[in-house]
Every structure is written in structure tokens, then in C-alpha cells.
Amino acid sequence: MRALGAVVALLLCGQLFAAETGNEATDATDDSCPKPPEIPKGYVEHMVRYHCQTYYKLRTAGDGVYTLDSNKQWTNKVTGEKLPECEAVCGKPKNPVDQVQRIMGGSLDAKGSFPWQAKMISHHNLTSGATLINEQWLLTTAKNLRLGHKNDTKAKDIAPTLRLYVGKKQEVEIEKVIFHPDNSTVDIGLIKLKQKVPVNERVMPICLPSKDYVNVGLVGYVSGWGRNANLNFTEHLKYVMLPVADQEKCVQYYEGSTVPEKKTPKSPVGVQPILNEHTFCAGLSKYQEDTCYGDAGSAFAVHDKDDDTWYAAGILSFDKSCRTAEYGVYVRVTSILDWIQTTIADN
């Protein structure tokens, strides 16, 4: 518990209790904290304030200040005897992307700028991406989860075949995978870990958006472990800046027409992406950089300057453009937000 951001109580003076074992008040008065002098017509009130460790924040309502009542119970004005809880901070990388230097050849070196980025390895040793959205859950694509499996393979049989890494090659165990109920048209799935991961400089979830950031021309950042220009899987996490594209132009590019009877059966790269109301497209960067095989499951991360927070606007679904096609395709996170929240709450 301590490693995962356990609550820390600071004694102002007087008495303190063991925060991790309950709400029993224990006399801790000694010479290091002498009893304060009394004043006429006044009284002394014992108070503690709870804080969370670095990379965690108080989730419970109230200000974290507790006073000792006449029954020797610590209580908060808002929450009563209920102890506060700490949750992981999201979308606040210690080394944000604008502090990272571009390296030769247009490749981008991400030194902890994308702590939500995870690497997933299939049982056929194929690399794909996943995105940490809280201490125990990740988003990825349904296609990633099914890599090397038949379409009718059950989720419970898929989970044990996957290897997942966060931070600096820290392997984490998967408890279960859950597919979106309409995963043939919504290419998304959730991964639940057996244990919560400790959040730190290298491991931090990205925030889920409460509003839609997908506007044509908006630039997002996509990191990944996918194939490089030589079509080899990279050993170093890279990222690229990509603009949101016009959806109608993207549909016309891959399908030939927005009129169903005029659609062509084949896209310019030989594989047809899923394009519907749950998706959006992003084009090439101004340096003609792009995502490629193995990057799917990574977030289209946008930085909201108003609250200095990073949000996952999309999850890369179609990663086969590799600079040979004009657009990558992403699942729009706001369109699946209710499903994400309900699924996590139910599991």
C-alpha cells in the first residue's frame, strides 16, 4: 500500500494514530511535541492533515484535515470518520514532450514524456501498443488482443498468452482482457492488471477526456514501439506529431466515396480500416513522419494548456499507413467513454 501512494498523516501537535491500521486514536504525546500552553477561555484542538505521496492526489472529498473528537476519533468536517484515499495523478509527465530534443533523421526520443505508453508482446512475438488509463487498466485495440488468435478465441484464453511492459521494461501481469461488445466496428479492448502499478516518473496514466478534442488541424502526439523506416521493431520509444485530418477526405481516400454503392473494395495500402462515427483520422507530420505496424493501441495524446494536462483523444487502430498512405485511423475515446467507465466499475 505504501508504494502505491499510501496516505501520510502529519501531526501538528498532540496525538496521532496509525493511519494504515484504522481510525483508532493512540496517544503519541512525547517531548518531541510538547503539549501547547492553555489560554483563558480557549482550548486546544488536535489536528492532522493527510497528504499523498508524489504522483498521487487525494480522491476523497474534504480538505484532508482531521480533528480529534471527544471520543478520540479523527473526523473530517465533510467525510466524518471515513479516511481519505489517494489516487494516481494522470496526464502530468515530469518531462513533457516540449522539453525533449529532436534527434537526427526525424526520429523522436521520448525520455519519460509518455509514461502511459505500454508495450504488448503477442504469443507470436509481435509488438503492439497499449495505453495506461489508471493504475490497473489499459486501453488497446481488439485487433492487438487477437494477434495470432482465431476470431472465436475466448478472452480468458487470450490473456495468459500476452506479455505487457510499462516504464523501463517493467513486466506486469494481466488478469483479464475485455473486448468492446461491438469490437468488429469499434476496434477497442481493455486490459486489467492483477495488481495496481506504482506510479512514478516513468509510469503514469494518461487522463480520459471529458470533452472532444478532435478538431481538424489539431496536432496530437503518438508514441510507440512500432516498426521503423527499415520495418524493424524499434528498441527505443519514439513519438511523432500528427494533425487531425478531415474525416470525409479520409473516408474518400480509403473507400473511394462516401456513397456506399460507389465505394471501392480496396484501400491504397491493401487493407481496409474501420471508418465510422467512432473513429477519426490523422495525417502525416510536416516531416512526412507516420505511425507504422506495431504502434496500434497507442494514444493520440493532446495537451490541454488550460489545465496543463494530457488527454487521450484517440487510440490508434489502423497503423498500416507507414508513410505509404496518407492517414492513420483512431478510435475516438469520447465515443467509448461510457463503456470504459462502466466496464471498469463492474470489474
Curated annotation (Swiss-Prot):
InterPro entries per record: Haptoglobin, Peptidase_S1_PA, Peptidase_S1_PA_chymotrypsin, Peptidase_S1A, Sushi/SCR/CCP_sf, Sushi_SCR_CCP_dom, Trypsin_dom
Record-linked PROSITE patterns: SUSHI, TRYPSIN_DOM
Residues carrying sugar: N125, N151, N183, N232
GO cellular component terms given for this protein: blood microparticle; extracellular space
Subcellular location: Secreted
Superkingdom as given in the UniProt entry: Eukaryota
Tissue-by-tissue expression: Expressed by the liver and secreted in plasma.
Residue ranges, annotated region (Interaction with CD163): 259-264
Gene3D superfamilies per the UniProt record, alphabetical: Complement Module, domain 1, Trypsin-like serine proteases
Sushi domain residues: 31-88
Family in the record: Belongs to the peptidase S1 family.
Function: As a result of hemolysis, hemoglobin is found to accumulate in the kidney and is secreted in the urine. Haptoglobin captures, and combines with free plasma hemoglobin to allow hepatic recycling of heme iron and to prevent kidney damage. Haptoglobin also acts as an antioxidant, has antibacterial activity and plays a role in modulating many aspects of the acute phase response. Hemoglobin/haptoglobin complexes are rapidly cleared by the macrophage CD163 scavenger receptor expressed on the surface of liver Kupfer cells through an endocytic lysosomal degradation pathway.
Assembly behavior: Tetramer of two alpha and two beta chains; disulfide-linked. The hemoglobin/haptoglobin complex is composed of a haptoglobin dimer bound to two hemoglobin alpha-beta dimers. Interacts with CD163. Interacts with ERGIC3.
Protein's name in the database: Haptoglobin
Native organism: Sus scrofa (Pig)
